[in-house]
From Swiss-Prot:
Pyrrolidone carboxylic acid carried by residues: 1
Keywords, in A-Z order: Amidation, Hormone, Pyrrolidone carboxylic acid, Secreted
Lineage: Eukaryota, Metazoa, Chordata, Craniata, Vertebrata
Modified residues annotated as Glycine amide in this record: 10
InterPro entries: GnRH
GO terms assigned for molecular function: hormone activity
This protein's name: Gonadoliberin-3
Function statement: Stimulates the secretion of gonadotropins; it stimulates the secretion of both luteinizing and follicle-stimulating hormones.
Species, as recorded: Oncorhynchus keta
GO CC entries: extracellular region
Length: 10
């Protein structure tokens, strides 16, 4: 599962 938390690239 690929997700991003605003200022955290992921």
């Amino acid at each position: 599962q690929h997700w991003s938390y605003g200022w955290l690239p992921g």
